[in-house]
UniProtKB/Swiss-Prot annotation:
It comes from Limosilactobacillus fermentum (strain NBRC 3956 / LMG 18251). It comes from the Bacteria. This is UvrABC system protein C. Interacts with UvrB in an incision complex. The keyword DNA damage applies. GO terms for biological process: nucleotide-excision repair; SOS response. GO terms for molecular function: DNA binding; excinuclease ABC activity.
Amino acid sequence: MASEYLEHKLALLPDQPGCYLMKNANAQIIYVGKAKNLKNRVRSYFKSSHTGKVAAMVEEVADFETIVTSSNKESFLLEITLIQKHQPYYNIKLKRGTGYPYIKITNERDPIIKITGQVKKDGAYYFGPYPNVYAAEETVHFIQKVFPLRRCHGYQGRPCLYYHLGQCLGCCFKEVPEEEYAVQTKRIKSFLNGNTAQVKKQLTARMERAAGQLEFERAAEIRDQLHYIEVTVEKQKIISNDKTPRDLFNFYLDKGWLSIQVFFIRQARLMKREKRLFPVVDTAEEEMTSFILQFYNRRNKLLPKEILLPEGLPNQEIEEILGVPVRTPQRGEKRDLLDMAKENAILSLNEKFRLLEMDRQKTTGAMKEITDELGLPTGHVIEAFDHSHIQGADPVSAMVVFVNGEPAKKLYRKYKLTTVVDHADEAASTREVIFRRYSRLLKEEKPMPDMIMMDGGPIQMEAAKDVLENQLGLNIPVIGMVKNDKHQTADLLYGDDAHHVNLDPRSQGFYLVQRIQDEVHRFAITYHRKVHTKHSLSSRLDEIHGVGPRTRNKLLKAFGSINKIAVAPVEEIRALGINQTTAQLIKVSLQGQAEVKKGSSHD
C-alpha cells in the first residue's frame, strides 16, 4: 500500500517513455528501471500484489523520481548509464571492468602477438574471447613457435634469444620486410579462424623433413605441435555451418530467479559459455535487455558480427544501440543453438534450486537437532543476547535473531543499559534487557521467539527466567551458551539445574550454536566500541571549562573527532558560535591532553 505522499506522486506520472529511480528512506537509489509508459509501469508496483524480491523492493520504496526521454532507445541508454552510476541494490549489475582474454596482433611496423583484456580501436586484430587466460596463453605460445613475428623489444644490434629459438623474425638485429610479416599475420588469422588443415600439412612436412635429417628432437617438438591442434582446436565440436563470429543469449525465469546463458560462437565452435543467475524485480524481458546492454558496455567492447536472441526482446532497439545485426531464428541450426542455451539455463536454475533446498534442509535440520537435544518442540526463531562493558563502564546489550537457522539482521536490536551498578553485574544487565525486550513485544502484541539463548552461564539464565516468568508471565525456554578456556563454543546449558546438553560438536546443530554465539558477541562488541568511543570523546570535551552539552555536540558534529578539533584553527572553532576565550581554551586543553598522552606512551 503506497503512502499518501507516494499516491500524490503516482497521480502526476506522465504517459511518456523514460526511466524511474526508486529510493529508500535514506534517499538511496535502490532500483532503476525503464518504461515505454512511465505512468503504467511505476503505478503497477504499488497497485498489484508481489512476492519475493519485488515485494522486498516495493516495501523499501519511500520515494521515486522519473526522467522523461524522447524515445525508447534513449531510455535504454539512460537506464544503463544510471545503473552503472548508482549501482542500485535490486538491479542486475555487471562491472564495467569485467572482461575476457583476447589474443591481439598489434598494428605496428614489427607486430607482436599477445594476450589482452582490453579491446581498443587501434587498428590491431583481436580474436576471442577465450574461456580463460590459460587457454589464450596456450594458443599464443603455439603461434609464437609456429608463426613467429616479433618477440623482443625491437632493434638492439644483436639477435635475441627468441630468434635463436625460432620464435622471432629478427627485428632485433635487422630490418624484417613488411611482406614477411604480412604472410605470417595472414597465416595466424587463418589458423585462429579455424583453418587448421593447411597448418597441419605444413607441420607434417616439417616433421618429416626433420626426421629425415635425423633431427629427432626437432621432429618430436613439431609432433607435439600437431598434437596440440588435434586435442585443443579440432576436438571442439563444430556446431555451425559458417564461421561468422556470433553471440547467443537465452534465459529461463522461475520463482523470481532469472537464469541466463551466453554462448560465444567462434570458428563455428562454441568457444566459451557464460552463465549467470539473478533474483529479479522487473519482467524477464526487461531484465534480459538490461543485462545484454550492460554486457556490451564493459571494458571489452569487441562485438560479434551477429547476435541471436529469443522471442520477446526489443531486437530493433538493441540493434540500433549496438550497431550489430540482432536476429531471432525460427528454424535450423541457429534455432537449435538457442534451444540448447534455453535447456542449459533451465538446468542451471534447477541446480540452484536444489542447492538452496539443501541449504534449507541443512539449517532446518540444525534447528531440529538443537530442539531434539533440548526436548523441545520444533522451533523456528531464536533470539540471543550478550552484554559488553569495560569494568562496568558504558554497559550495553545486543540481541541477534536467527530464523530457521539464518540470521535475520533487520530484526537485530541494540540496548544502552541504564541500570546503575557499582561494577559489571551480569544479572542486573540481563534483567534489564530481557524486561525491555519482551515487555515491548507484549505491549505491541508481537510474536515471541521459540527460545532465548544467553551468551553466558547459570547467572544470566536464572536472571532471564526470573523476569520472563515472575514479571512478564511468559514461558519461553532459556538456554545458556558456554565457552571453553579458549573462548570457543563448548556446550549448551538448559533446565532448572542448568545441566549440560552435550550437543555433538560435529553436528550441524553445534555449528549453528557457534554461529549464533559468534554473531551476538560480534554485534555486542561492535556496538560497545562505538558507544565507548563516543563517550570518551564527550568526556574529554566536558572537562574543558566553558564547554557544555550544546557546545560539545556542535564540535563533534562539525569536526567528528578530538584530533580534528585539536588541529583546527581557532577561527574555525569560533565559526560555530563559540567565543574567542572558549575557542582558545579548547585548543590549549586538547593540545595539552595530546601532549600528556604522547608523553605517557613513551614511558
